[in-house]
Amino acid sequence: MDEKREENILKKQEELRLFQEALPRKGRLAGLDVGTKTIGLALCDSQWIIASPAETIRRKKFTLDLELLRQFVEKQQVKGLVIGLPLNLDGSDSPRTQSVRAFAKNVAPLSLPVLMWDERWSTKAVTRTLLEADASRARRSEVVDKMAAAYILQGAIDSFAMF
């Protein structure tokens, strides 16, 4: 294994450890797929076993987006956020990476632990699944963001057991 890859794995393990330490032993987590027009939301159970799509926020301006997210977090009793990080296929930052990192910093008023999670392939995987299920274009556009959020969240909670 090359040195840079090993360094990245160790860094991700440390991020996961810190995130888990900041969380209560049990409680729901929310997954977010942050786009320019929408924010897909997903939830997992309090045991961190299964993630499910929840809803989609149509973005307007950040203060309104944050208020809708705050309401969702309170209603669902969310204890931590897993936010999809849009990286290029080679792992480098994409044009959207910086704006998603800024979004993650701007949700600080929610006072929740935040984990940034590699979201490469999430939307493509979900779209492929929906195509295989013969979902119409309208149905795909209606659910793809919250399903991508569930895909991101499931990846994160699956990794909890590994590290």
Curated annotation (Swiss-Prot):
Tagged with keyword Nuclease: yes
Keywords of this entry: Cytoplasm, Hydrolase, Nuclease, Ribosome biogenesis
PANTHER family associated with the record: POLYNUCLEOTIDYL TRANSFERASE, RIBONUCLEASE H-LIKE SUPERFAMILY PROTEIN
Pfam family, one: RuvX
Molecular functions (GO terms): nuclease activity
Single GO biological process annotation from the record: rRNA 5'-end processing
Predominant place of localization: cytoplasm
Sequence similarity: Belongs to the YqgF nuclease family.
Protein name: Putative pre-16S rRNA nuclease
